[in-house]
Amino acid sequence: MAHTKTRRTYGFLMVLLILGSACGNLVASGSAGSPPSNEPGGGGLSEQVVLDQLSESDLYGNNKRAWQSLQSSWGKRSSSGDVSDPDIYMTGHFVPLVITDGTNTIDWDTFERLASGQSAQQQQQQPLQQQSQSGEDFDDLAGEPDVEKRAWKSMNVAWGKRRQAQGWNKFRGAWGKREPTWNNLKGMWGKRDQWQKLHGGWGKRSQLPSN
């Protein structure tokens, strides 16, 4: 009787082992045949990798749009058109280039008047509130055109025409005309010098004295 119970117990255990191994094989085959999942730890791409790829594509698009907007401002002409206001050059947005020799004392207001082309008559036609200035101010205004003229000539001489200075003459003499040393140089190779003595030694027979 006890022997029969032991046999039944062993048989039941064997059936359980067989069923367990069969279930394990079924689970393994099902996981191998299923498509890769996107869950972390699965066989496919993780959710973080997918998000990184999407963010990289969005970043590329944003960079492309930003580059195009930047390129429109300096890489090609903008559609806004050219500047049509001529007064923009006198408002400080554009600073004119001033080339001087360092001797002029012209101030900025005087330079603006000279650059804008206003004449002395237009400068004297000031508003009524400016006519109430002191006599010293009027004296300064009376002598201002001469000061402007001298200052303009002093500035113009540096780049508008040749300055008749001794330094310019020395510089011009160095390459603009021949100096006396050129004649000495020309005598060395530009003309024959003692050629009769030279050709007698190698160019042809020398005239030997007869006995």
From Swiss-Prot:
The keyword Nuclease does not apply. It comes from the Eukaryota. In larvae, strongly expressed in the midgut region before and in between the copper cells, and in a group of cells in the posterior part of the larval midgut. Expressed in the neurons of many areas including the subesophageal ganglion/tritocerebrum (SOG), olfactory glomeruli, lateral ventral protocerebrum, mushroom body, the optic lobe medulla and in the antennal lobes. Keywords: Amidation, Cleavage on pair of basic residues, Neuropeptide, Secreted, Signal. Disruption phenotype: In both sexes RNA-mediated knockdown results in decreased day- and night-time sleep due to reduced sleep-bout duration. The number of sleep-bouts is not affected. The modification Tryptophan amide is found at residues 74, 159, 175, 189, 202. Residues 115-142, 168-190 are annotated as: Disordered. Its main location: secreted. One of its GO terms (biological process) is neuropeptide signaling pathway. Residues 25-63, 78-148, 206-211 form a propeptide. The keyword Signal applies. It is found in: Secreted. Residues 115-135 have a biased composition (Low complexity). Changing residue 195 to A: Reduced activation of SPR. Residues 1-24 form the signal peptide. Induction: Up-regulated by sleep deprivation. All five Drostatin-B peptides activate SPR with comparable efficiency, however Drostatin-B4 is a slightly more potent ligand. This is Allatostatins MIP. It comes from Drosophila melanogaster (Fruit fly). The lineage of its organism: Eukaryota, Metazoa, Ecdysozoa, Arthropoda, Hexapoda.
